[in-house]
């Protein structure tokens, strides 16, 4: 979002900014119109007050029409209500010299960097939110985004108070929530978020995901939309992130700049995910918690959901982690460390705070498996014992997380030490002190304290099927 309050900067920069709020509603309205609708009443000589009044009325009408209000040209209650609604700092009508008509990136692969983090949320949550916000746009375009940790990125994300060095000071809690710059070098493309807001991942405070999707839309070249259903609508409104979808208006706008998604040529006819997760014969390749969510891996994609939530989301593995292969065979999370381990054939990957660690993949034999083991069928971390259980054919191994060593006297037979469980195991999930052992279209709830199966369920029961 690039727009300028100082005329000399209009030629070179395109960003949103905010000054101190005036003392009365009339002055505030003039400030709002100059800030967001290119009202330039302060440039009209004092002797031409009639011209000034006419211009102000025209700008009020323009603003009212944009927001779908009754067009009166008067500063009425509904108009003031919109003006006082929290919003994006980018202008709705920009000076013709401030921004080219169509601004876009001229490359498909873009980098982003989170320069600093808000203290309102866990770093892992912020990372995940921006990853998902970028994915919203990559899902409907050929664009691909990669996070970097140092150096200059195409898109830099910054949390800041007040004056933060770009001529567009934040105004404190409420008012403008964030601003961004249209594509280009240097500061162009960057997105700034007002640290005075209380950033959250819920309906309380200001939802970071929703604002991030909006601002990144600007970073990719989108202007504001006057369609209230569009994520590019200027004012903030809460939508549940788990059920959020881009409007047809948003998809049309972004694809007019970049086109539709390009099929991944590395996927050899992978097919489509099942039309419903409730298919009676559906099985999973791996299942694990990831933070407060549960991931269900299948072929080249995975479903994820919050326990207890009715919403189910589906994502390709490559869009989440471009360096991770499809066909994950086993997975587990060490929640206290925010570490996720993914296994395929004789290799495994470490995902730390949702970011793949460098120097991976590594060989599963470095964990202590003999050369005869060529792949892991399933894995699960037991936080009470601080042990990882690896299931391979009819046997299982136990790995000590504290010692980082495979326990002695292993492998052991699954059928002997897990009564009621017969090989082969597809996936194992630890949830609320129980193991959920997936075998084909069914799962067995296993109580490790009682050493017995306590329930038999459909594999898809997690989805309310």
Swiss-Prot record:
Q: Which residues form the signal peptide?
A: 1-21
Q: Which cysteines are joined by disulfide bonds?
A: 278-465
**Where is the major localization of this protein?**
secreted
Q: Which residues form the propeptide?
A: 22-101
Q: How is the cofactor bound?
A: Binds 4 Ca(2+) ions per subunit. Binds 2 Zn(2+) ions per subunit.
Q: Where is this motif: Cysteine switch?
A: 86-93
Binding positions for Ca(2+) 2 per the UniProt entry:
154, 186, 190
Please provide, in alphabetical order, the Gene Ontology terms of the cellular component aspect for this entry: cytoplasm; extracellular matrix; extracellular space; nucleus
Q: What class of enzyme is it?
A: hydrolase
Assigned keywords, A-Z: Calcium, Disulfide bond, Extracellular matrix, Glycoprotein, Hydrolase, Metal-binding, Metalloprotease, Protease, Repeat, Secreted, Signal, Zinc, Zymogen
GO terms under biological process = bronchiole development; cellular response to virus; collagen catabolic process; elastin catabolic process; extracellular matrix organization; lung alveolus development; negative regulation of endothelial cell-matrix adhesion via fibronectin; negative regulation of transcription by RNA polymerase II
Q: Which cofactor names does the annotation list? A: Ca(2+); Zn(2+)
Q: Which residues form the active site?
A: 215
Q: Which residues are noted in the entry as Ca(2+) 3-binding?
A: 171-172, 174, 176, 194, 197
Give the binding site residues for Zn(2+) 2: 88, 214, 218, 224
Q: Where does Ca(2+) 4 bind?
A: 285, 377, 426
Enzyme Commission designation: 3.4.24.65
State the compartments where it is located: Secreted, Extracellular space, Extracellular matrix
Q: Which reaction does it catalyse?
A: Hydrolysis of soluble and insoluble elastin. Specific cleavages are also produced at 14-Ala-|-Leu-15 and 16-Tyr-|-Leu-17 in the B chain of insulin
Q: Which family does it belong to?
A: Belongs to the peptidase M10A family.
According to the UniProt entry, the note on domains is: The conserved cysteine present in the cysteine-switch motif binds the catalytic zinc ion, thus inhibiting the enzyme. The dissociation of the cysteine from the zinc ion upon the activation-peptide release activates the enzyme.
Tell me, what does this protein do in biology?
Answer: May be involved in tissue injury and remodeling. Has significant elastolytic activity. Can accept large and small amino acids at the P1' site, but has a preference for leucine. Aromatic or hydrophobic residues are preferred at the P1 site, with small hydrophobic residues (preferably alanine) occupying P3.
Write the protein's name.
Macrophage metalloelastase
